[in-house]
């Protein structure tokens, strides 16, 4: 059930936004010039919110406002406006641990209007678009690996006291509406004939019906849905894919954490890996040059290996040097370094398995379920698109059903190459 709409709430437009902002912006984030002269455009291309660019004489800012329904689903899919507050709070938490080198600055939040203003990122572009274009980013793996390590470690029981962790869990437990969307769209609907499913038909019909009859895969999906619902390990971004990352050659910013909540670490990691694999399998639809395509596919696979390597290295370093955190208490290992390393190895082995399952779940969702990805959906030749998707579905099943057999990320990318 959605919350009641505040009496002062109203959706803003390009015409009404300047007047609203004129009395609320501080000098440090003021666009400059007269409000009536600001250039305002609505650029939201996501599923949830209105996104405005406000350009003045001195500065450009972003304003993001939640609507009382899912933008991609219309007024027939109501949603609480409180999701704007959750996104704002996740951005603040992420900036606390990952810093503004990876997280955009937020200028102010208005709960009654379900709106916040934030830094305009330029010349950054959405990563997904650049992956379609076949562009490489030398800092990407280092930045995303560090983002994952800092945010997941520092909001977990390993990195914070039990009291702090439980308070954080309580704060984000109320973001249940967006969690329900994830529970439905990723963990449930791709595995039966749900109304919102949207696959390449009829070319992929046989593969989709095979997935619906795959009891072994469905059992794993249900088990990981339960883990998603019950394992409050750390504060997640909740929707970490290439559409939630903006990049330049030298800078990376993670955006759009409105799905943030306390959940299993492997969900964020798996989402990102799954999207890199989708980009990998989509390449025949975007580049007919075999040598160039193979080179870029290798770069995509190495992003998976390198991101995991950076993540585990940074996470382990934070763990080694921690000064608080009630899980794996420091006192237990002061005289036994080998025991700590063994505990860490076991932790990462479990996390790898869970991350791979989640990667496969994300891949299935994007091919069979609601809200697919541009790198596949925009391949105009349906036979070619279906071929890419069929290979991706084969990989997804392998990750879901056989995750434990993959002992490292190198074995994962070798499996992808033979699909």
From Swiss-Prot:
Substrate binds at residues 239, 365. It comes from the Bacteria. It catalyses: 5-(methylsulfanyl)-D-ribose + ATP = 5-(methylsulfanyl)-alpha-D-ribose 1-phosphate + ADP + H(+); 5-deoxy-D-ribose + ATP = 5-deoxy-alpha-D-ribose 1-phosphate + ADP + H(+). Keywords: Amino-acid biosynthesis, ATP-binding, Kinase, Methionine biosynthesis, Nucleotide-binding, Transferase. Pfam families: APH (PF01636). One of its GO terms (molecular function) is S-methyl-5-thioribose kinase activity. InterPro entries: Aminoglycoside_PTrfase (IPR002575), Kinase-like_dom_sf (IPR011009), Methylthioribose_kinase (IPR009212). GO terms for biological process: L-methionine salvage from methylthioadenosine. Pathway: Amino-acid biosynthesis; L-methionine biosynthesis via salvage pathway; S-methyl-5-thio-alpha-D-ribose 1-phosphate from S-methyl-5'-thioadenosine (hydrolase route): step 2/2. Disruption phenotype: Inactivation of the gene precludes growth of the strain with 5-deoxyribose. ATP binds at residues 49, 64, 256-258. Its EC number is 2.7.1.100. Homodimer. Catalyzes the phosphorylation of methylthioribose into methylthioribose-1-phosphate. Also catalyzes the phosphorylation of 5-deoxyribose to 5-deoxyribose-1-phosphate. Part of a bifunctional DHAP-shunt salvage pathway for SAM by-products. HAMAP family: Salvage_MtnK (MF_01683). Belongs to the methylthioribose kinase family. This is Methylthioribose kinase.
